[in-house]
Regions:
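Structural motif
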Residues: 131-139
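Amphipathic alpha-helical elements of HEAT/ARM-like alpha-solenoid repeat scaffolds that form extended
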Residues: 2, 16-17, 51-66, 98, ...
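Amphipathic alpha-helical interaction modules
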Residues: 32-72
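Short terminal alpha-helical segments
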Residues: 1-42
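Short beta-strand-centered aromatic/proline hotspots
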Residues: 141-145
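Long protein-protein interaction modules used by eukaryotic assembly/scaffold proteins
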Residues: 61-75, 79-92
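Charge-rich, solvent-exposed alpha-helical interaction surfaces
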Residues: 20, 34-41, 77, 81, ...
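Amphipathic alpha-helical binding modules
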Residues: 80-132
Length: 145
Protein backbone atom coordinates (compact mmCIF):
# COMPACT_ATOMS: atom_id res chain seq x y z
CA UNK A 1 0.00 0.00 0.00
CA UNK A 2 1.22 3.49 -0.66
CA UNK A 3 0.66 7.17 -0.06
CA UNK A 4 0.75 9.72 -2.84
CA UNK A 5 0.26 12.82 -0.72
CA UNK A 6 -0.07 14.12 2.82
CA UNK A 7 -3.86 14.38 2.75
CA UNK A 8 -5.92 12.03 4.88
CA UNK A 9 -7.48 10.31 1.86
CA UNK A 10 -4.28 10.14 -0.19
CA UNK A 11 -3.37 6.53 0.52
CA UNK A 12 -4.29 3.20 -1.00
CA UNK A 13 -5.28 1.86 2.42
CA UNK A 14 -7.69 4.74 3.06
CA UNK A 15 -9.26 4.48 -0.40
CA UNK A 16 -9.66 0.71 -0.24
CA UNK A 17 -11.26 0.86 3.20
CA UNK A 18 -13.54 3.81 2.41
CA UNK A 19 -14.75 2.35 -0.89
CA UNK A 20 -15.47 -1.02 0.72
CA UNK A 21 -17.42 0.68 3.51
CA UNK A 22 -19.56 2.69 1.07
CA UNK A 23 -20.22 -0.36 -1.13
CA UNK A 24 -21.48 -2.32 1.88
CA UNK A 25 -23.51 0.65 3.13
CA UNK A 26 -25.17 1.02 -0.26
CA UNK A 27 -26.21 -2.64 -0.04
CA UNK A 28 -28.07 -1.83 3.18
CA UNK A 29 -25.65 -3.33 5.68
CA UNK A 30 -25.66 -1.64 9.13
CA UNK A 31 -22.80 0.81 9.78
CA UNK A 32 -21.65 -0.94 12.96
CA UNK A 33 -21.47 -4.30 11.18
CA UNK A 34 -19.48 -2.85 8.28
CA UNK A 35 -16.98 -1.29 10.67
CA UNK A 36 -16.66 -4.50 12.67
CA UNK A 37 -16.10 -6.63 9.54
CA UNK A 38 -13.52 -4.30 8.02
CA UNK A 39 -11.57 -3.96 11.27
CA UNK A 40 -11.58 -7.73 11.79
CA UNK A 41 -10.03 -8.26 8.36
CA UNK A 42 -7.29 -5.67 8.89
CA UNK A 43 -6.52 -6.93 12.40
CA UNK A 44 -5.91 -10.42 11.01
CA UNK A 45 -3.02 -8.96 9.03
CA UNK A 46 -1.64 -6.17 11.27
CA UNK A 47 -1.09 -5.53 14.97
CA UNK A 48 -3.57 -3.07 16.48
CA UNK A 49 -0.91 -0.39 17.00
CA UNK A 50 0.59 -0.70 13.49
CA UNK A 51 0.74 2.65 11.67
CA UNK A 52 -0.86 1.12 8.58
CA UNK A 53 -4.11 0.94 10.53
CA UNK A 54 -4.19 4.71 11.03
CA UNK A 55 -5.54 5.13 7.51
CA UNK A 56 -8.06 2.35 8.14
CA UNK A 57 -9.39 4.18 11.21
CA UNK A 58 -9.41 7.50 9.33
CA UNK A 59 -11.43 5.96 6.47
CA UNK A 60 -13.86 4.28 8.85
CA UNK A 61 -14.29 7.53 10.75
CA UNK A 62 -15.00 9.54 7.62
CA UNK A 63 -17.40 6.91 6.26
CA UNK A 64 -19.27 6.54 9.56
CA UNK A 65 -19.50 10.32 9.90
CA UNK A 66 -20.83 10.61 6.35
CA UNK A 67 -23.38 7.85 6.93
CA UNK A 68 -25.03 9.30 9.99
CA UNK A 69 -22.59 9.63 12.85
CA UNK A 70 -19.20 8.43 13.92
CA UNK A 71 -19.13 5.80 16.66
CA UNK A 72 -17.52 6.75 19.94
CA UNK A 73 -14.91 3.99 19.71
CA UNK A 74 -13.74 5.00 16.23
CA UNK A 75 -13.72 8.70 17.13
CA UNK A 76 -11.73 8.02 20.31
CA UNK A 77 -9.21 5.93 18.40
CA UNK A 78 -8.76 8.64 15.74
CA UNK A 79 -8.45 11.30 18.43
CA UNK A 80 -5.78 9.23 20.21
CA UNK A 81 -3.81 8.65 16.99
CA UNK A 82 -3.79 12.35 16.17
CA UNK A 83 -3.47 13.94 19.63
CA UNK A 84 -0.71 11.57 20.79
CA UNK A 85 1.31 12.15 17.62
CA UNK A 86 1.19 8.49 16.59
CA UNK A 87 0.50 9.21 12.93
CA UNK A 88 3.26 11.81 12.70
CA UNK A 89 5.67 9.34 14.37
CA UNK A 90 4.66 6.71 11.81
CA UNK A 91 5.29 9.15 8.97
CA UNK A 92 8.71 9.94 10.45
CA UNK A 93 9.48 6.20 10.31
CA UNK A 94 8.57 6.36 6.62
CA UNK A 95 11.21 9.13 6.18
CA UNK A 96 8.76 11.96 5.49
CA UNK A 97 10.32 15.39 5.07
CA UNK A 98 9.81 18.09 7.73
CA UNK A 99 7.61 19.95 5.24
CA UNK A 100 5.48 16.83 4.67
CA UNK A 101 5.16 16.30 8.42
CA UNK A 102 3.96 19.87 8.91
CA UNK A 103 1.40 19.52 6.12
CA UNK A 104 0.28 16.14 7.43
CA UNK A 105 -0.22 17.56 10.93
CA UNK A 106 -2.38 20.32 9.47
CA UNK A 107 -4.40 17.77 7.46
CA UNK A 108 -4.87 15.62 10.57
CA UNK A 109 -6.14 18.56 12.61
CA UNK A 110 -8.52 19.66 9.86
CA UNK A 111 -9.83 16.10 9.59
CA UNK A 112 -10.33 15.78 13.34
CA UNK A 113 -12.19 19.10 13.42
CA UNK A 114 -14.48 18.03 10.58
CA UNK A 115 -15.51 14.71 12.15
CA UNK A 116 -15.93 16.36 15.56
CA UNK A 117 -19.05 18.16 14.37
CA UNK A 118 -22.18 16.25 13.49
CA UNK A 119 -23.26 16.07 9.86
CA UNK A 120 -26.71 17.54 9.18
CA UNK A 121 -27.90 14.68 6.97
CA UNK A 122 -26.68 11.15 6.49
CA UNK A 123 -25.66 9.79 3.11
CA UNK A 124 -28.53 7.92 1.52
CA UNK A 125 -27.94 4.35 0.43
CA UNK A 126 -27.74 3.79 -3.32
CA UNK A 127 -29.42 0.45 -3.82
CA UNK A 128 -28.88 -1.21 -7.21
CA UNK A 129 -31.62 -0.43 -9.70
CA UNK A 130 -33.62 -3.37 -10.94
CA UNK A 131 -35.21 -3.29 -14.36
CA UNK A 132 -37.40 -5.82 -16.07
CA UNK A 133 -36.42 -6.83 -19.58
CA UNK A 134 -38.64 -8.88 -21.83
CA UNK A 135 -37.36 -10.99 -24.67
CA UNK A 136 -39.28 -11.82 -27.81
CA UNK A 137 -40.93 -14.84 -26.20
CA UNK A 138 -42.24 -12.54 -23.44
CA UNK A 139 -40.25 -14.00 -20.56
CA UNK A 140 -39.24 -11.49 -17.93
CA UNK A 141 -35.71 -11.22 -16.58
CA UNK A 142 -34.50 -9.20 -13.64
CA UNK A 143 -31.27 -7.35 -14.18
CA UNK A 144 -29.23 -5.27 -11.78
CA UNK A 145 -27.55 -2.18 -13.16
Amino acid sequence: MGNWGVGISQSDTYCETYERFIEEYDKGKPVSQITQDILAEWLEEFEEDDGVLHDVFFALGKAEWLCGGISESIFNRINEIIKNGKDIAYWQELSATPSDLKQRQKALQTFLNSISTSKATAKKEKFPRITILQNQVHHSYLCQK
